[in-house]
């Protein structure tokens, strides 16, 4: 809630300042004017007679530069009715001026549904937002793919006021999330990976139209975080990604090599959901399709709150025709890559595992440390037990493993969850690509700054956990998108992050970072100062090796 409050504050400041400069703007360039209520607006004509869009103004966070914003430009037809689950269809041209003054509808999420809207309106979410300072320039384009566990996320959650301090154009497309995007039966009607196809279509839109917004279509950087990292790394490996769509990539916290990044049995999932919708004959393809396609948005969302969704291998569009571990073998792109994780990127998995366990076992501490960690390995489905055996040896002292001393094990739990779910998949992506294409730079980072704000417990609160969140998953984004009011060192950190990310987008070299020279390193620790460290596998033991790791345990609460 705090985040929304801050965002509203930013918007309000924008509106006030807007009034002050309205006069100035009116006389700047053609295409700019004012709407009926006197607020300044700007018109842009798209290519190929697609139509005209009307935008307005925002202001950067630190130097109050004015930028133009076009929020909610549709790039695809609403994926509703017979288009539901199907690859996106390009938006047909419109006549007159289309208002892009506010964000379009987010793709349906159970917690954010507007009950007044019809399903067709709710599903009309394939809009993108463009932020730019100069319509006639030719600036590098940063194309952000949001995270949200493949079931959440929106353009609105990513205010541009830090990134627009630099001379770049920011594009934030929306893509389908949850069942309405990811369900598949490997058939024409439910081909799979529709959300990745949404992103591909938005990238094509950028190629066609971004020059009208002052962006250079030859200089597009994709960046994605968490589930968005899964999508961004899929685009890197996919044979369906044309070579001109983007020239650099940033993959934050996760990759398509993670076990959570691929849905192994979407067909069974589709049938399960069909049955839960109360339909009959869910084992017959046409009945199944009819059921899923005609289901009310609210019903689909309501019965899928405990399902997880993600990309699939073998979709009919050929986006991921083989396992990522196979696809990477023929990787030939020359795309500079910046990838990494937060220092304690897995602590959110520890938290949700803890919640799930506490719901089943009345006293979590009655489990031994070994039993507790086994449950985490089980989430990863490694049937050989190799992961568990090796990580038990690496991360736990022998005497702790058979004890109930969970407090002492907290740093080990941090390293274990971070390694399995985030760090190892990122390191695999980075080192496989570096090894195959040594002449293309790969930069690896560990984000280690601990500031005032955290995303720990953002959704459900964090006061009930017997541990703290550390440098939590998504905390890096606090410094890239203007969701909080940052001061002092936090603002300095934000300036550093924006400098690194945008310098990479501008010339392919992230300011102050060192590229991999071998599969062992070096890597870069991102903090108020950036430091180069030689051995990247040291990141896997970063919590247990930390002399100050006592702060990860809660002082006021027994585990
Ligand atoms: C005029 O622009 C303001 C801000 O740009 C917007 O909030 C308002 O809805 C617009 N009014 C009309 C009539 O389009
Ligand atoms: C997507 O954006 C377009 C243009 O602003 C708008 O017409 C459309 O209604 C938006 N979709 C929703 C559901 O808001
Ligand atoms: C989705 O994200 C929004 C905005 O961050 C949040 O308000 C909402 O609670 C989230 N929904 C779920 C189901 O996590
Ligand atoms: C916008 O970009 C053009 C082309 O680079 C340049 O000539 C112009 O001065 C820029 N305008 C502003 C306000 O910076
Ligand atoms: C929970 O289990 C631990 C370890 O067996 C034990 O020390 C503790 O007293 C138990 N707590 C409760 C409330 O039963
Ligand atoms: C892990 O395996 C179990 C049992 O085979 C299965 O039900 C579950 O879906 C699997 N989870 C993942 C993430 O593959």
What feature does the model see in each segment?
Residues 140, 213-226:
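Alpha/beta-hydrolase fold nucleophile elbow
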Residues 298-491, 500, 507:
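Substrate-gating cap/lid region and adjacent catalytic-acid/histidine neighborhood
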Residues 174, 223, 238, 250-253, ...:
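Alpha/beta-hydrolase-fold catalytic nucleophile elbow
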Residues 229-241:
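Short glycine-enriched nucleophile-adjacent loop
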Residues 2-6, 436-440, 450-451, 487-559:
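Alpha/beta-hydrolase-fold serine-hydrolase catalytic core, especially in secreted/extracellular enzymes
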Residues 191-212, 268-274:
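Alpha/beta-hydrolase active-site loop
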Residues 243-255:
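A conserved short beta-strand
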Residues 2-196, 217, 490-497, 505-514, ...:
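Non-catalytic accessory segments of hydrolases
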């Amino acid at each position: 809630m705090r985040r929304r409050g801050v965002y509203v504050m930013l918007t309000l400041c924008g509106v006030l300042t807007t009034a002050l400069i309205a006069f100035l703007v009116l006389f700047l360039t053609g295409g700019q004017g004012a709407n009926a209520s006197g607020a300044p607006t700007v018109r842009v004509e798209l290519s190929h007679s697609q139509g005209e869009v009307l935008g307005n103004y925002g202001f950067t966070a630190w130097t109050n530069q004015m930028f133009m914003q076009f929020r909610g430009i549709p790039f695809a037809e609403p994926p509703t009715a017979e288009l539901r689950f199907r690859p996106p269809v390009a938006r047909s041209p419109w006549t007159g001026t289309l208002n892009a003054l506010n964000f379009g509808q987010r793709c349906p999420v159970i917690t954010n549904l507007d009950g007044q809207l019809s399903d067709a309106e709710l599903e009309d979410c394939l809009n993108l937002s463009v932020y730019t300072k100069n319509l006639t320039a030719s600036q590098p384009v940063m194309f952000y793919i949001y995270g949200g566990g493949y079931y959440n996320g929106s353009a609105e959650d990513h205010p541009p006021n830090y990134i627009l301090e630099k001379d770049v154009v920011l594009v934030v497309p929306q893509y389908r999330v949850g069942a309405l995007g990811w369900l598949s039966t490997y058939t024409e009607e439910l081909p799979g990976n529709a959300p990745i196809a949404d992103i591909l279509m938005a990238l094509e839109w950028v190629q066609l139209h971004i020059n009208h917004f002052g962006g250079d279509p030859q200089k597009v950087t994709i960046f994605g975080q968490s589930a968005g990292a899964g999508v961004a790394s899929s685009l890197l490996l996919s044979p369906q990604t044309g070579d001109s769509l983007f020239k650099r990539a940033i993959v934050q916290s996760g990759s398509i090599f993670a076990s959570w990044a691929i849905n192994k049995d979407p067909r069974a999932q589709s049938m399960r959901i069909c049955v839960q919708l109360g339909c009959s004959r869910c084992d017959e393809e046409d009945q199944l399709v009819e059921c899923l396609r005609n289901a009310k948005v609210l019903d689909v969302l309501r019965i899928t709150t405990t399902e997880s969704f993600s990309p699939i291998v073998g979709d009919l569009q050929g986006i991921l025709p083989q396992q990522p571990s196979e696809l990477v073998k023929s990787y030939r792109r020359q795309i500079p890559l910046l990838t990494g994780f937060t220092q304690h990127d897995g602590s959110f998995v520890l938290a949700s595992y803890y919640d799930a366990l506490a719901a089943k076992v009345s006293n979590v501490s009655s489990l031994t440390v070994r039993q507790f960690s086994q449950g985490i390995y089980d989430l990863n489905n490694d049937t050989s037990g190799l992961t568990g055996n090796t990580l038990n040896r690496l991360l736990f002292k022998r005497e702790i493993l058979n004890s109930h001393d969970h407090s002492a094990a907290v740093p080990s739990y941090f390293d274990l969850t971070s390694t399995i779910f985030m760090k190892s998949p990122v390191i695999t992506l980075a080192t496989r690509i570096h090894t195959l294409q040594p002449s293309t730079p790969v930069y690896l980072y560990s984000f280690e700054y601990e500031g005032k704000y955290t995303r720990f417990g953002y959704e459900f609160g964090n006061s009930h956990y017997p541990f703290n969140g550390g440098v939590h998953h998504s905390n890096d984004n606090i410094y890239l998108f203007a969701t909080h009011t940052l001061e002092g060192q936090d603002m300095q950190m934000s300036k550093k992050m924006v400098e690194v990310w945008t310098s990479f987008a501008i010339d392919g070299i992230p300011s102050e970072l060192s590229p991999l020279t071998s599969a062992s390193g070096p890597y870069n620790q991102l903090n108020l100062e950036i430091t180069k460290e030689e051995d990247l596998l040291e990141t896997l033991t970063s919590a247990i090796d930390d002399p100050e790791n006592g702060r990860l345990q809660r002082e006021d609460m027994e585990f």
